[in-house]
A protein has these predicted regions:
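N-terminal assembly/interaction segments in proteins that build large macromolecular machines
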Residues: 1-204
Length: 204
């Protein structure tokens, strides 16, 4: 999976800004050396809004699979999702298309911080452990560590996409993906996602 700088997810398809931003994004996708500042200045002049590109990325995959985009109603949240498969024919099935839709909705609604636990900010993780230890400092040491690990597992289920409860059932996202893969007799792997929200800063 490759990632490069790209303003694509900043599109707003059902607003005046979207009508201006979409051609900018399309042009940059075709030519990554395009002068975004020149186009940004032109867009500001056309619609009278102070447009700022605070974050811009793109996703791509090597081999079978798909990269899909979703803009939520109201154009306040946008999602890019990259999912890999082993078979080209998998991507044409209704089950796979539904999976793409479901996972983008999951990302929109649940706002995960990372794909899985290996991608979490380790300093944040250690801070969560410290908070849990402080909360239960009066417990026996052995009990504290068990409680802390339980709290961390809960934290994973809140902030890691694959560990989150799937929006449509009581299983995890990881288990749902596995069930669809089994149904299609293929291997399906979520490789990466990007979530954008209007008003976010580069530090968000």
């Amino acid at each position: 999976m490759r990632s490069r700088r790209d303003p694509g997810p900043r599109q707003h398809t059902d607003a005046p800004l979207g009508k201006t931003a979409a051609p900018v994004a399309a042009g940059y996708a075709a030519d990554s050396s395009a002068n975004l500042e020149e186009q940004r200045t032109k867009a500001v002049a056309e619609i009278g809004e102070n447009i700022q590109f605070t974050r811009n990325e793109s996703l791509s995959i090597d081999g079978p699979g798909a990269v899909t985009a979703y803009i939520h109603h109201g154009a306040k949240v946008g999602v890019l999702l990259a999912i890999a498969t082993n078979k080209d024919e998998t991507t044409g099935t209704d089950a796979f298309k539904e999976l793409l839709s479901d996972i983008t909705l999951q990302i929109t609604a649940a706002s995960p911080d990372a794909l899985d636990r290996t991608q979490l900010d380790q300093s944040k993780l250690e801070k969560e452990r410290e908070i849990a230890r402080e909360q239960f400092k009066d417990k026996p040491a052995q009990a504290i560590e068990k409680i802390v690990e339980g709290k961390i597992e809960k934290y994973f289920s809140e902030v890691c996409l694959v560990d989150q409860d799937f929006v449509k059932s009581d299983i995890s996202v990881k288990d749902h993906v596995a069930s669809v893969a089994k149904e299609l007799d293929d291997e399906i792997v979520i490789q990466a996602f990007l979530r954008y929200q209007v008003g976010e800063t580069q530090e968000d």
